[in-house]
């Protein structure tokens, strides 16, 4: 998969057509999940469940933002064994499946939820695994044209029209800090040293969806280590925060691995020096 292209092409849609996804494409997704989909924490047991539109009435009472569920022809449920890293692992895996669906020209939308047991009861699921992530998928309704910046490198920007809603996000210079939190001095020089490759990884990490587009995280670069730092956010609960972290880690890892080899994250490392109160070191990657 060309992760850089899929990350730039993915979009969250909020209205789906009734057209169903062909069974062949769903079969490809299942095969990808079983054979290829990366696991952040491989020892956590997971299961992928594909639901059709008949599941919508059951989900409407148990999932969606403030119980508002986006109707779709299909839904993905990622089930997980209970684990302290179940949420972050689910975000990592499910976002990879979202990018696979993007490669198959299928649209998606992450769904929020708060109660796994309520969803399992509504769907009559008897598995001991818990609901860890939900994504609606299908073919999105066409929307008004919006300009999208397709940024190929720090100096090459392609402006194109795209059929999607526009949601502003923090850019690389907002997310990445050098040496100490809020310091930007030396950031551009570091990016230049890696000949745009590191910048592309951070750019990919600036694009993922997050709950209400809050992006309650950032990166702190110290020496040859990159820390993913979680910020307190009154609007984001623990489950959505964990999913958000997994998603952003997948985006960074998928692009960085194209030039740095396999990216291995250490979860919950000791806090780096100078991290302000209210911030938590969620993971670290040693280059």
Regions found by a protein language model. Name each.
Residues 1-287:
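Acidic, surface-exposed loops and disordered segments
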